[in-house]
C-alpha cells in the first residue's frame, strides 16, 4: 500500500499496490515540498472495500464491523491529522512492521505517521491484542514499532509542517509564547472543498498536541496551548476514548460535544451521526439527540484533554498513584488561560435572594450554644443588631426579614472584635453570619486605613473556601450585601485569568475571596500584601483542611508565615465556620485564634443537638452490589412528578464512576450530566448554571459538590455510594451531601436517598453513624431500617465500644480495639492515656490505659488484666476497668464466653476487647453531651492517616 499527498491542496496522485480494492485518498501535508510517500503506516485518510463488500475508512471513519459508523466530517481535509472518529472496531492494516491482525477489536488507531524526516516515524502501537486498549508508546523511533525510546513524558512533538515533524519541545507554560492560529475547521464541507488547502496556518510551532492526529482546533488568540484540543476522539493523539472517542453502545456511534463557552468554540466530534442511543454531551451526557458522550470538560470516554503527559505505561488509561487504572479517564482539563468567570448582574442576584428568603422558616434552625464568651448576647431582629444603616436597607431590599439562629449568636461576637469558631447545620446562613459584620466594620473604618491597604495591593478581608464553586457562591452573596456601598469584593481562584485578577486587586480590593492555591501563589510571589489584613475567614474549614492532618499549618505556611500576615496578627480577627470540625481545624484554630482573658479556648458557637438540617428527610435502601444499585436508581428516577424528572444530584465516590453512571442513565433515555474535578472550570460553572436554570435535571458528581452549591429548588439527593473515610469523616460528608437539598426557601422538605450495601466494609463501618443521624433528626415518621440497624450492631461488635473509634483509632474513646481510658485517645490500636509503645507496663498492654493493643487494666498481653498473654483471668476477680484487645477479664482463655447477664460490671463485647457495661454507658452518656463528632479540642485520631483524596481521585483538591 502506498499513498502520496500533494502539498498545499494541489492535484494529488493516487497509487495502488496489488490490493486493487484499496482506494487511497489524497493527503495534504501543508508544505510545498512535493510528494511524500507513506509506506507501511496508513497515515492518510484511506478507505478500502473489503472482500466481503464492506467498506473500511481509515483516518476518517469506519463502516464495517457491527454496522457502526464512526464518520468524520468530510471536508476533504484528507490529511490524516483531522482524526474524527478513528475506528476502534475497524479492520487494521498494519503492514510492514505491524502486519495484519485478525483480532482488531481493541486497536487504538490506524493512523501511523511516517515522517521520513530525521529517520523517525510516529506511530501508535497497533500490535494491540484484544486487551491492548491504548498505545504502549506514543512516539517510537523509525526502526521499531515497539517500546523503543518511548517519549511518554512531558515532551511533545512540535509542528506538523508539510511531511515532517519538528523537534521535541516542552509541553509547559512556554507554549503560550507560540503564535498558534490553527484553523478551527468550522467551515462546511462545500465551502471548504472550494477553498485552497492552505495549511500554512499551522505555524512553525503549531500545537504541540495536534500533530498526533487531530487538527489544532481551538487555538483562539491568547489561548494557552494547553487548552488547544485537537480531540476528535479518534484515539490518535494518545488515548482519546476507546471506541471512536467515546463510550459506545451497540450499533450506535456518534459522540459529539459542542459545549461552548464565551471564549472558545468547541466542536468535539467523533463518530457518525446515526446513533440510536448516543449520549448528548453539551458538556456531559444527553438523551436521544444522537449527539455525544464527548465530555468536553473532562472525565472519561472522550476527554478533550490530549494524552496523558508525563505518564508512562499508558495502556488504556492513565495509572493513578493509588495503583488503579482509570481505563480511559483523562487527566484534568484546564479552562482557557484568559477565561474569566461570568459576573452576574446585581439586580439578578437581589431578585434571586429575595425569592429564596421569602419563605424562610427560622423555626427549623438548630439551636446553638455560645461557649467561652464574656456574654451570651443574641440578636432577635435586625433593628437591634447595630449593623450599619446601609446594610439594614439592603436586608430589607432582599427581604431578609428574620435573623437566623447562627447569625443571632455570631454577629454580636464578631462586631465586638472576637475570634469565633462557628458551627451550624447546612443552609443555616453562615455566610451572612460572618459577612455582614465584616462589611459593617469596613464601612466604619477611616479612609486612611482603607487607602493604605489599597496602595499596598492588600485586602482588608480574606475569605478562603475549599472549592471554587463555594468561593463563587460567597462572592455573589457578599456582592449582594455590599450593594450601595463603596466596598469592592473580588474573586480569584485557579484557572481564572490570573493577570486580570491581579489588575483588579491593584485597582482596589477590600474583600478578597478565593481558594488556597491561588491566594498562596499571590502571597509567595508578593503580588498581594497581607500587612493590612483585618479579617481572615476559613469557610467550611474542615473540608479546607481535611487532607492536611499531618501538618495543616505547614500547608498554610505561604500565608501564615508571610511577614505582613504575622505583623497584622494583633489587629486581625480570625473566623472559622463549618457544619463540622476535625483535629486539623483545631490545630489551625489554636495557632491563629485569640482567646479571651481567663479562657483556655477561643469562643465557640456550637450546635446544641443534631447536625443535620430538619428540612431534610432521609430514606435508605439496601442494595447488594452495583447491579442492584443501578436497578434501584432507575426505579427511583422513573418516578416522575407530573411527567417531570425531579431535580436530583447523584453522588458517587470517584470521578471515573460519574461517566459510567451517567452513561447507564442516558442509555435509558434520561438526560444526565456529569461534574467532577477533571472538568475545566469554565465547564463546571456552565454546568452548574444549567442545573440551576433547569436546563439539566440530573447531575452526577463527586464530593466536589457536597458543599458550596446552593440550589434552592433541589428536590433530591441520591447517595449512589456512601461517603468514604473513617466513620466520623464519612458522617460529616453525609451531612453535607444531604444538606444540598432542603435549602432555605423551600416550602417542602428535601429528600436524601442513600443506597447501603451490607457487603461493603465501608458501608458497614458507617452504619452506626447513620443510625445516630436518623435518631438525632427526631422525626416521628423516620425510623431506623431493620437492615441498617443490624449492620450497625454488627459493626459495633467488631470495632470496639463505639464502632471504629470515636476518639482513638479503631476503638472507643479509650482507643484501639476497645478501651475506655480517656486522656490522649491513644494511637491506632491504642488505649486511652499516654501509654507507651505497645503498652505502658505490660506486653502489648499498658497500665493506666496503655498504648497499642492495650486496655486500661493491669496491663496483660494484648490488653488483658492478667500480666500474661491474651488476657487470662485474674483469679476470677471482678474487672475494674475495660480489657484490652484479645482479652476478656473473666474468660480464662482470653476470649469471651457467652454471657447474657447485663450486670453493670459484666464485660461487654467489643472489638477484640471487652469493656464493662457501666463503662460503656458512661462513655455513651459522655458522647451524647458532645457535638456528635470529634470536634472542638477533644482528642481525635491522633495517628490517623490522611485520606489523600486528591491522589486517589475520590475528591477534588482545590489547592
Curated annotation (Swiss-Prot):
Biased composition (Low complexity): 271-280, 302-317
Biased composition (Basic and acidic residues): 71-97, 122-134, 166-181, 189-201, 219-239, 255-270
Residue span of region Disordered: 1-336, 793-834, 858-959
Domain Helicase C-terminal: 632-792
Primary location group: cytoplasm
Residues binding ATP, per UniProt: 424-431
Cofactor: Mg(2+)
Reactions catalysed, as given in the entry: ATP + H2O = ADP + phosphate + H(+)
Compartments, record wording: Cytoplasm, Perinuclear region; Cytoplasmic granule; Cytoplasm; Cytoplasm, P-body
Gene Ontology CC terms, in alphabetical order: cytoplasm; nucleus; P granule; P-body; perinuclear region of cytoplasm; RNAi effector complex
Motif stretch (DEAD box): 539-542
A Pfam family that the UniProt record links to this protein: DEAD
EC number(s) stated in the UniProt entry for this protein: 3.6.4.13
Effect of residue 540 to Q: Results in accumulation in cytoplasm
Biased composition (Gly residues): 281-301, 800-834, 858-872
Family annotation (SUPFAM superfamilies): P-loop containing nucleoside triphosphate hydrolases (SSF52540)
Biased composition, class Polar residues, residue ranges: 98-118, 137-160, 202-213, 930-941
Bias (Acidic residues) ranges: 942-959
Class of enzymatic activity (EC top level): hydrolase
GO MF, one example: ATP binding
Notes on the domains: The C-terminal region is necessary for localization to P granules.
Role noted for this protein: Probable ATP-dependent RNA helicase involved in RNAi-mediated gene silencing. Specifically required in the endogenous siRNA pathway for biogenesis of secondary endogenous small interfering RNA (siRNA) intermediates called 22G-RNAs. May associate with and recruit rde-10 to primary siRNA-targeted mRNA for secondary siRNA synthesis. May be recruited to target mRNAs by rde-1 and/or ergo-1.
Subunit structure: Interacts with wago-1, ergo-1 and rde-1.
The family this protein is said to belong to: Belongs to the DEAD box helicase family. DDX3/DED1 subfamily.
Protein name: DEAD-box ATP-dependent RNA helicase rde-12
Amino acid at each position: 500500500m502506498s499513498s502520496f499527498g500533494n502539498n498545499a491542496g494541489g492535484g494529488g496522485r493516487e497509487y495502488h499496490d496489488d490490493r486493487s480494492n484499496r482506494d487511497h485518498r489524497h493527503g495534504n501535508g501543508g508544505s510545498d515540498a512535493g510528494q511524500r510517500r507513506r509506506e507501511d503506516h496508513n497515515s492518510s485518510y484511506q478507505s478500502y472495500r473489503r472482500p466481503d463488500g464492506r467498506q473500511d475508512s481509515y483516518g476518517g471513519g469506519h463502516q464495517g464491523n457491527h454496522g457502526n459508523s464512526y464518520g468524520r466530517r468530510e471536508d476533504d481535509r484528507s490529511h490524516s491529522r483531522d482524526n474524527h472518529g478513528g475506528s476502534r472496531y475497524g479492520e487494521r492494516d498494519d503492514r510492514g512492521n505491524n502486519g495484519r491482525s485478525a483480532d482488531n477489536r481493541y486497536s487504538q488507531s490506524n493512523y501511523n505517521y511516517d515522517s521520513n524526516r530525521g529517520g523517525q516515524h510516529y506511530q501508535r502501537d497497533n500490535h494491540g491484542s484484544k486487551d491492548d486498549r491504548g498505545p504502549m508508546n506514543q512516539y517510537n523511533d523509525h526502526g521499531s514499532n515497539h517500546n523503543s525510546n518511548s517519549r511518554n513524558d512531558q515532551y511533545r512533538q512540535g509542528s506538523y509542517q508539510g511531511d515532517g515533524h519538528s523537534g521535541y519541545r516542552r509541553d509547559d507554560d512556554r507554549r503560550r509564547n507560540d503564535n498558534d492560529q490553527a484553523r478551527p475547521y468550522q467551515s462546511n464541507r462545500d465551502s471548504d472543498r472550494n477553498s485552497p488547502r492552505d495549511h500554512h496556518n499551522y505555524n512553525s510551532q503549531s500545537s504541540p498536541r495536534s500533530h498526533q492526529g487531530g487538527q489544532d482546533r481551538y487555538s483562539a488568540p491568547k489561548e494557552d496551548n494547553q487548552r488547544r484540543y485537537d480531540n476528535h476522539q479518534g484515539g490518535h493523539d494518545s488515548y482519546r476514548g476507546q471506541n471512536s472517542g467515546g463510550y459506545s453502545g451497540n450499533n450506535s456511534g456518534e459522540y459529539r460535544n459542542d459545549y461552548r463557552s464565551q471564549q472558545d468554540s468547541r466542536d468535539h466530534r467523533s463518530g457518525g451521526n446515526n446513533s440510536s442511543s448516543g449520549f448528548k454531551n453539551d458538556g456531559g451526557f444527553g438523551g436521544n439527540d444522537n449527539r455525544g458522550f464527548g465530555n468536553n470538560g473532562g472525565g472519561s470516554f472522550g476527554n478533550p484533554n490530549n494524552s496523558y503527559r508525563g505518564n508512562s505505561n499508558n495502556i488504556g488509561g492513565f495509572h493513578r498513584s493509588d495503583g488503579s487504572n482509570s481505563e480511559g479517564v483523562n487527566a484534568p482539563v484546564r479552562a482557557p488561560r484568559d477565561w474569566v468567570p461570568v459576573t452576574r448582574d446585581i439586580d439578578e442576584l437581589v431578585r434571586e435572594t429575595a425569592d429564596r428568603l421569602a419563605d424562610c422558616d427560622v423555626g427549623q434552625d438548630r439551636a446553638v450554644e455560645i461557649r467561652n464568651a464574656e456574654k451570651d448576647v443574641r440578636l432577635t431582629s435586625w433593628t437591634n443588631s447595630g449593623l450599619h444603616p446601609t446594610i439594614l436597607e439592603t436586608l430589607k431590599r432582599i427581604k431578609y426579614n428574620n435573623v437566623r439562629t447562627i447569625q443571632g449568636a455570631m454577629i454580636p461576637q464578631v462586631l465586638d472584635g472576637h475570634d469565633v469558631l462557628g458551627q451550624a447545620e447546612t443552609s443555616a446562613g453562615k455566610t451572612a453570619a460572618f459577612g455582614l459584620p465584616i462589611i459593617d466594620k469596613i464601612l466604619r473604618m477611616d479612609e486612611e486605613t482603607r487607602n493604605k491597604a489599597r496602595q499596598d495591593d492588600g485586602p482588608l478581608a480574606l475569605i478562603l473556601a475549599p472549592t471554587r464553586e463555594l468561593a463563587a457562591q460567597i462572592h455573589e452573596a457578599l456582592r449582594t450585601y455590599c450593594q450601595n456601598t463603596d466596598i469592592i469584593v473580588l474573586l480569584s481562584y485557579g484557572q481564572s485569568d490570573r493577570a486580570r485578577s491581579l489588575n483588579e486587586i491593584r485597582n482596589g480590593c477590600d474583600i478578597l475571596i478565593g481558594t488556597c492555591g491561588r491566594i498562596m501563589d499571590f502571597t509567595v510571589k508578593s503580588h498581594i500584601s497581607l500587612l493590612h489584613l483585618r479579617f481572615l475567614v476559613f469557610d467550611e474549614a474542615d473540608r479546607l483542611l481535611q487532607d492536611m492532618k499531618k501538618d495543616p499549618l505547614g500547608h498554610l505556611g505561604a500565608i501564615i508565615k508571610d511577614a505582613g500576615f504575622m505583623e497584622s496578627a494583633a489587629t486581625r480577627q480570625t473566623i472559622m465556620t463549618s457544619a463540622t470540625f476535625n483535629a486539623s481545624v483545631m490545630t489551625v484554630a489554636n495557632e491563629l485564634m485569640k482567646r479571651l482573658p481567663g479562657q483556655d479556648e477561643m469562643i465557640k458557637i456550637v450546635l446544641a443537638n443534631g447536625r443535620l438540617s430538619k428540612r431534610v428527610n432521609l430514606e435508605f435502601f439496601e442494595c447488594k452490589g452495583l447491579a442492584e444499585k443501578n436497578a434501584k436508581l432507575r426505579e427511583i428516577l422513573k418516578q416522575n412528578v407530573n411527567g417531570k424528572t425531579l431535580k436530583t444530584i447523584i453522588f458517587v465516590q470517584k470521578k471515573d464512576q460519574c461517566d459510567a453512571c451517567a452513561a447507564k442513565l442516558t442509555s435509558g433515555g434520561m438526560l444526565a450530566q456529569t461534574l467532577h474535578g477533571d472538568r475545566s472550570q469554565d465547564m463546571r460553572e456552565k454546568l452548574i448554571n444549567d442545573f440551576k436554570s433547569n436546563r439539566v435535571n440530573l447531575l452526577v458528581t463527586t464530593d466536589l459538590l457536597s458543599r458550596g452549591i446552593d440550589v434552592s429548588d433541589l428536590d433530591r439527593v441520591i447517595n449512589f455510594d456512601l461517603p468514604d473515610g473513617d466513620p466520623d469523616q464519612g458522617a460529616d460528608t453525609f451531612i453535607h451531601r444531604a444538606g444540598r437539598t432542603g435549602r432555605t426557601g423551600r416550602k417542602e422538605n428535601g429528600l436524601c436517598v442513600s443506597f447501603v450495601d451490607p457487603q461493603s466494609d465501608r458501608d458497614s463501618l458507617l452504619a452506626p453513624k447513620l443510625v445516630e443521624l436518623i435518631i438525632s433528626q427526631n422525626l416521628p415518621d423516620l425510623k431506623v431500617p431493620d437492615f441498617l440497624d443490624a449492620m450497625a450492631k454488627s459493626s459495633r461488635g467488631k470495632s470496639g465500644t463505639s464502632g471504629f473509634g470515636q476518639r482513638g483509632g479503631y476503638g472507643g474513646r479509650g482507643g484501639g480495639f476497645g478501651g475506655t481510658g480517656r486522656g490522649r485517645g491513644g494511637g491506632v490500636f491504642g488505649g486511652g492515656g499516654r501509654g507507651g509503645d505497645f503498652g505502658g507496663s505490660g506486653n502489648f498492654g499498658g497500665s493506666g490505659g496503655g498504648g497499642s493493643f492495650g486496655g486500661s487494666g493491669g496491663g496483660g498481653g494484648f490488653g488483658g488484666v492478667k500480666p500474661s498473654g491474651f488476657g487470662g483471668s485474674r483469679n476470677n476477680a471482678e474487672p475494674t476497668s475495660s480489657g484490652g484487645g484479645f482479652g476478656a477479664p473473666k474468660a480464662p482463655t482470653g476470649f469471651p464466653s457467652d454471657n447474657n447477664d447485663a450486670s453493670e460490671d459484666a464485660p461487654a463485647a467489643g472489638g477484640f476487647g471487652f469493656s464493662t457495661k457501666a463503662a460503656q454507658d458512661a462513655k455513651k452518656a459522655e458522647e451524647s453531651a458532645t457535638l456528635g463528632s470529634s470536634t472542638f479540642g477533644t482528642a481525635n485520631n491522633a495517628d490517623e492517616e490522611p485520606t489523600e483524596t486528591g491522589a486517589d481521585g475520590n475528591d477534588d483538591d482545590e489547592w
